[in-house]
Every structure is written in C-alpha cells, then in structure tokens.
C-alpha cells in the first residue's frame, strides 16, 4: 500500500471520529489509524496466497490491547503482554462476524486483520473502533471486500439513547449493544439489556443504524481520498458438476434429509453421498486431492440447496413447522454434594449445569486497560467433542466457547441479586453433553434452573431461543424457530435472543448474508418472544421459584457492617483477634476497607458463633454498662479485665471491693470471671472499670469484702469501708497496709503515663 498521508474526521455522538492512513503500517494491504476521543486503534489488513486444497475462507481477525496505551505495566513476572485476554478474544470475534460474509463466493485467499489499541482514554472502548477500522482498512485495500461497513455502540442512559457511550455512561446504562451494518441493512448485533421490551430494542437498533450511516459517510469520504486500486476477482468457472449431481441425486438427497433423528439422518445422507462420490470418482485412492475437494465442495452446495428448498416449502429436516419448538425436558438436583445442578434438554441439545457458591475470596480478578475489578458471577461454557459424536484434540476453551459463555453469562446477569442481598460469589458451569443447535441458549435456560435450584434469589427466570432465516430474494424468506445444527449451517441467520417475560437481556445476530432488513429483525423479535414465553412455562413447571435455602453443602455466609475505625480492633495486633476467632470457630472472616465483614463457614452454627465474636470484638464500650469479664493480668495496683474480645480495662485495687485487700493475687487469679461496670473511657480510649460498683448495682454480696474484714493490724481493724478512707488520709494502720499503698500509687501512675 503506497499512498500519501490522508486524514478525515467527523463528529459522531459526543466526540470526533477520525481515520488516517499513509503514515503508519504502509506495507500492509490496507491500514488505518482510528481515533475517537483520545482512544487510538491501529488496524492493518494483509493477504496471502491460498493454501493448496483449502475448502474454506481463512479469515483471521485479531484484537490486542497494549497496556502502555493506558500507562500501565502487565502484571506477573514477565512485563509484556502474553496470550489474549477474554476481552481481547471477544473483541476479535466482534471484528470477524460482520466482515466474514462480505467476500466473493469461492474466495479462499488468506486474509488477516490485526487491530491494536495504542492509546486509550479509558472512556472510549477500542473494540468498536477496531471493528470500524477493520472494515475501513479492507475497504481501502486492493482486496475484493464488499464494503463499506459501519459499526456503533449504543447505550440508553436516563431513558435516552446514546451513540458511542463512554465508560462512565455505560455504568448507568440499561443497554450495551454493538450494531454493524451497511447503509441499508444490519449485518451484526451483540447486545445486553436490563429486560428491555422488544419495541424499545427495535428503536435502539434503528437509532444505531442512523449512526452507522454517519460512519459509512466518513468511510466513503476516506475511500475517495485514498482512491485505492481494487484487484478484480474472478470466481471459479462452473464445470457443470453441481448440475450433474442435482439431476442425479436431488430427489434421493431430499428424502434422506427428511429422516428423523440426527444420527439416522446423517447416515442416510452419507449413503447418498457415497453413491454420488463413487459415480464421480470411481477410485478415490487414485484421485488427487483437488478432485476430491472439488467434489466435497459441490456436494456441500447441493446439500445446502436441498435443505433450503425444503424449508422454504414449509418442511424442516425433523418434520416441525417453522414456529415449533423441539421437545423440552428439565431436571434439577441431579448431582450430590454440588451447590446446585440442573439438566436442560431441547431436542438433541443438552446442557448439564453445575453451580458453585463461594466467598469474595473466590471472585475473579480482571485486569486490562481499565482499572482492575472483580467479578462475582461467572458462567463457563464447555463444548466437548463427544457432544456431537466426534473425536478431536482436547485443549483449553477456544474462541467459540469463550464467546458462547459470555453471551450466556451476560444474558443471565441482569436478574441476579445484588451483592448486598446475596453476598456469594457464583460460578455456573455449562457442559454441553449433546448438541444439535443453539447450545448457548440451552446454557441460558439450564443456568436459570440451576440458580433457582441452588437458592440464588434471581428476580425473574431467563430463557433463550435461536431463530434462523432462509431467504431466496428480498420478498421470499421465512423464519424458523429453534434451529437445528443443519439449519444453522445452511441457513442465512442465527439470531439468538434471551430474556425474561418482561423483556430482552441478551441478543446476538450472526449472518451468512450481507445483511437483513428491519422487517426481518422486527419479525424475529416477535417470534422469539412467543417461543421464549413457552419455554419459560415449561421450565417453571420443574421449579416454579428459587429455593428459600441454599444447598446444605454450600458455605454459610453472614455479613455485618462495622465502623472503619473498628477494623483494627477486629484484626488485633498482628492479626491476633481475627485469627483467634477463625481458629476457635473454624469460620473464615473477610473484612474490607469500608468495614463490611463477611463470615463464611461450612455450617450455620460456627458461622453464628464467629459472628457473635466479631460483634463482641467490635462493640463500643458503653459507660455505665456492666460486662461479664475475664481477668487477663494482675498488677500490684489493680487487675486488667477483658470485657470484649481484645479489649481490656483496668479495675484499680480501690475499685475491686468495698473491703480491704492487701494483695490481689491472693484473692483473684488470671482467668477468673468477674462482673465489672465501666466507669470511664478517657481520651486515650483507656477503659476504667469497677467491680465494687457493679456488685452494688446488681445487689450482690461481695465475697472479697468478707475476706478483707480481718485484714491489717489492730490499728487498721474495724469497718472495711472506713479503712480505705483512713488510708487515703495518710493515717493507715499497720505496716502491711502502709507498705502496700505506696507501690499501688506508684504503679497506678506508671500505668496512666
């Protein structure tokens, strides 16, 4: 690519969107710097020669975020970015989906589109800019891309639709949706909402399309200034093989496609294909790979034609009409020990759900360009190869699994209770144990069942459905509810919509055609709602509402709020107090900087005991209140008594008893229980206690006063209450009494200092 520096810009939404090329990445087939606000994304497209024998279009879209774009360093030992994060994988999929259908039929050159966020203002996300940049880079490249294509993110803040909302606005938004499209049609939708009614969702899509047209206007202006030379692409010539196979095997193939059952249907189709292959290639072992791949490609086209013709004629492969759902089966509580489990089956698609409930220690920490945050809800989607009867290498989750998991997670999230109402960290695992279409929506339904079975108080149950499309011209099209894998593969659309009886929570549109009209979208929303309500009714016959109690095997969580200045008292010196509570009760205690204390235990009794000790440890000492204390240490001048966990007060020897006591360690011992009254808390938060006044207020006899009646010499005898008064006047009798007074006064002074 060799052009002079070109730049165009236009205000869209609240900021300026700009494209620039001819300055950076000039050797790429097409490159563009996209800027919105102070977020800048570099997008470059490149192309390679097709690999021999390839039978698919090898398009790869990749999105990355350089943390230096926000002035940050990657965490960990190696201070550089590694494998893509979940956010980067999801953004890569967003780039790919609207671009993929916009290529000539039969085009198999390798194409890569790479996007990198190189500056971020932390308000304008780079994902939608990468989508715009990917389409723009391809549009100004020599490649035969059928652009232009625009994208926009839409929010709804305070009842008003907003194009390109900032991160702060999205925090308050009831909608987060990205829409891609051409000037006349919508090409892709990915959105999440708080139970938004269908008519409001349709309004938001129309609003997004208006903004998309503004983006396309800017792309067209950019295209004219760059004025690229497009390389013409010649589609492969028709060798007549498709017509030959159609004439010979269309009828047999049509019959095979109407066989009931996925496995039986696949075997019937395979039998017809094997006969056709033997006709075209008598000796497959002697044929070259090009010939075999050509047959497979043409046979795929014939299969597509048969399936689409059947659907347009009103017949689906499994015999249903266009609006019917497959048979639905729901179960809960399949598994022991787990905190919740469910099974959702729709036809030959089956999702096994397990639920785990944990504490804040189990939250997932997420770091990226934005400030680090934690997630209290996670939904993991797994798609093992046995679910479709195949053997494949066993690896970690791929892009598809991460994408499906995110769709299901964000579709369920709006109905979850707040952390204040339900402090548990929630993990949902959806294992797809059988698959024949729409497994992500089965995960949504199964997750709802599992959450209700585990006692999570969701506000409304959520169900999901996928609606397909077969179109033969602008006026000949039909929608099909609850699509099979075959219908997904050969159809034109996979429109997944999840929600409650009140409205939509998740929406995802994928197309194999260049776009669909608003009429098709509106009809799909209406048809999907009817199916969703029917599914919800069947789910609620299995479990009508969330259980009131969580599983007996789940941790018991109790929560309280303490004053932040009491956090130190709870933790204690070196963690002594909090560690002691945990060791004696077996509970786990967590406290945050705001004073929220969470107590978790495997059983209710230990959690309650730990909470009692936490409350005692952080309670405020009240003057005039009587406490049941324990002697923690004895000095010559008095005794220290623990009245709350980790909180001691001093009972001066003069406040120990109404009688005379010559030596405290002769009448009390460490560990003795003692009732004391708080008489003062000084400015240094030191507590002064009185055993004598506590007993007087309670009207109880003081055994120490009785023991002290005979204390001292003859001069110190007499009434016990008179003796301390005489000693305070300096006329104490007896050497023992006099000797004891001096050190007590001295010791008391040292304590006060």
UniProtKB/Swiss-Prot annotation:
Major place of residence: cytoplasm
Ranges for domain KH: 555-614
Binding, Mg(2+): 488, 494
UniProt-listed GO biological process terms: mRNA catabolic process; RNA catabolic process; RNA processing
An MF annotation (GO) of this entry: magnesium ion binding
Pfam families membership: KH_1 (PF00013), PNPase (PF03726), RNase_PH (PF01138), RNase_PH_C (PF03725), S1 (PF00575)
Cofactors (names): Mg(2+)
Sorted UniProt keywords: Cytoplasm, Magnesium, Metal-binding, Nucleotidyltransferase, RNA-binding, Transferase
Biased composition (Acidic residues): 698-719
Keyword hit for RNA-binding: yes
Enzyme class, spelled out: transferase
InterPro entries: ExoRNase_PH_dom1, ExoRNase_PH_dom2, ExoRNase_PH_dom2_sf, KH_dom, KH_dom_type_1, KH_dom_type_1_sf, NA-bd_OB-fold, PNPase
Transmembrane segments: none
Domain S1 motif: residue ranges: 624-692
Chain intervals for the UniProt region annotation (Disordered): 698-753
GO cellular component, one term: cytosol
Catalytic activity entry: RNA(n+1) + phosphate = RNA(n) + a ribonucleoside 5'-diphosphate
EC annotation from Swiss-Prot or TrEMBL: 2.7.7.8
Subcellular location, record wording: Cytoplasm
SUPFAM superfamilies with a match to the protein in the record: Eukaryotic type KH-domain (KH-domain type I) (SSF54791), Nucleic acid-binding proteins (SSF50249), Polynucleotide phosphorylase/guanosine pentaphosphate synthase (PNPase/GPSI), domain 3 (SSF46915), Ribonuclease PH domain 2-like (SSF55666), Ribosomal protein S5 domain 2-like (SSF54211)
Function: Involved in mRNA degradation. Catalyzes the phosphorolysis of single-stranded polyribonucleotides processively in the 3'- to 5'-direction.
Family: Belongs to the polyribonucleotide nucleotidyltransferase family.
Protein name per the record: Polyribonucleotide nucleotidyltransferase
Species of the source: Rhodopirellula baltica (strain DSM 10527 / NCIMB 13988 / SH1)
């Amino acid at each position: 690519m060799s052009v002079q520096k070109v730049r165009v810009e236009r205000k869209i939404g609240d900021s300026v969107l700009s494209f620039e090329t001819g300055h950076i990445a000039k050797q790429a087939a097409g490159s563009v710097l996209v800027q919105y606000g102070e977020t800048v994304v570099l997008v470059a497209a490149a192309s390679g020669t097709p690999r021999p024998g390839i039978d698919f279009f090898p398009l790869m879209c990749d999105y990355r975020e350089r943390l230096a774009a926000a002035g940050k360093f990657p965490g960990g030992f190696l201070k550089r970015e590694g494998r893509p994060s979940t956010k980067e994988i999801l953004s890569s999929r967003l780039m790919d989906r609207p671009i993929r259908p916009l290529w000539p039929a039969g085009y198999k050159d390798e194409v890569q589109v790479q996007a990198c966020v190189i500056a971020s203002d932390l308000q304008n996300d780079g994902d939608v800019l990468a989508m715009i940049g990917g389409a723009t880079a391809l549009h100004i490249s020599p490649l035969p891309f059928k652009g232009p294509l625009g994208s926009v993110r839409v929010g709804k803040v305070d009842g008003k639709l907003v194009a390109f909302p900032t991160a702060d606005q999205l925090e308050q938004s009831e909608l987060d949706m990205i829409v891609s499209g051409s000037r006349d049609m919508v090409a892709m939708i990915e959105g999440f909402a708080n139970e938004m009614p269908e008519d409001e969702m349709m309004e938001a899509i129309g609003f997004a399309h208006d903004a998309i047209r503004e983006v396309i206007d800017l792309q067209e202006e950019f295209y004219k200034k760059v004025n690229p030379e497009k390389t013409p692409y010649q589609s492969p010539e028709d060798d007549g093989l498709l017509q030959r196979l159609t004439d010979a095997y269309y009828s047999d193939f049509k019959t095979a496609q109407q066989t009931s059952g996925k496995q039986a249907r696949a075997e019937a189709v395979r039998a017809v294909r094997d006969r056709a292959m033997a006709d075209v290639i008598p000796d497959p072992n002697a044929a070259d790979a090009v010939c075999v791949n050509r047959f497979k490609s043409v046979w795929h086209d014939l299969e597509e034609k048969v399936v689409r013709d059947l659907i347009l004629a009103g017949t689906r492969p499994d015999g249903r009409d266009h609006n019917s759902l497959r048979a639905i089966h729901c179960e809960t509580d399949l598994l022991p020990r787990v905190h919740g489990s469910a099974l959702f089956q729709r036809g030959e698609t089956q999702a096994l759900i397990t639920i785990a409930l944990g504490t804040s220690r189990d939250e997932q920490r997420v770091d990226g360009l934005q400030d680090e945050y934690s997630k209290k809800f996670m939904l993991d989607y797994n798609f093992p190869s046995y679910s479709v009867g195949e053997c494949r290498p066993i690896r970690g989750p791929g892009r598809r699994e991460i994408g499906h998991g995110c769709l299901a997670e964000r579709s369920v999230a709006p109905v979850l209770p707040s952390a204040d109402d339900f402090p548990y960290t929630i993990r949902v695992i959806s294992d797809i144990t059988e698959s024949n279409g729409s497994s992500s929506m089965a995960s949504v339904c199964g997750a709802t069942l599992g959450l209700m079975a585990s006692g999570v108080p969701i506000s409304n149950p959520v169900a999901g459905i996928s609606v397909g499309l077969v179109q033969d011209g602008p006026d000949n099209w039909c929608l099909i509810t609850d699509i099979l894998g075959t219908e997904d593969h050969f159809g034109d659309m996979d429109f997944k919509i999840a929600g409650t009886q009140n409205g939509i929570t998740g929406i995802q549109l994928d197309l194999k055609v260049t776009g669909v009209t608003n009429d098709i979208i509106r009809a799909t929303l209406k048809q999907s709602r009817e199916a969703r309500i029917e599914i919800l009714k069947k789910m609620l016959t299995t479990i009508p509402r969330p259980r009131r109690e969580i599983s007996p095997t789940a941790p018991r969580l109790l929560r309280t709020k303490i004053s932040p200045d009491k956090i130190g008292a709870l933790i204690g010196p070196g963690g002594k107090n909090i560690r002691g509570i945990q060791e004696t009760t077996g509970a786990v205690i967590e406290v945050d900087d705001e004073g929220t204390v969470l107590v978790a235990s495997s059983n209710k009794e230990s959690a309650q005991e730990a909470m009692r000790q936490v409350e005692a440890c952080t309670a405020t000492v009240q003057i005039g209140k009587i406490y049941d204390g324990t002697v923690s240490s004895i000095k010559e001048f008095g005794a220290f008594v623990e009245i709350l966990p980790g909180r001691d007060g001093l009972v001066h020897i003069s406040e120990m008893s109404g009688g005379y006591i010559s030596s405290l360690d002769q009448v009390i011992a460490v560990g003795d229980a003692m009732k004391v009254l708080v008489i003062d808390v000084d400015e240094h938060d030191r507590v002064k206690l009185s055993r004598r006044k506590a007993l007087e207020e309670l009207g109880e006899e003081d055994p120490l006063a009785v023991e002290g009646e005979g204390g001292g010499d003859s001069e110190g005898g007499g009434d016990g209450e008179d003796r301390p008064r005489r000693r305070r006047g300096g006329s104490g009798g007896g050497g023992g009494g006099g000797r004891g007074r001096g050190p007590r006064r001295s010791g008391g002074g040292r304590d006060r200092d």
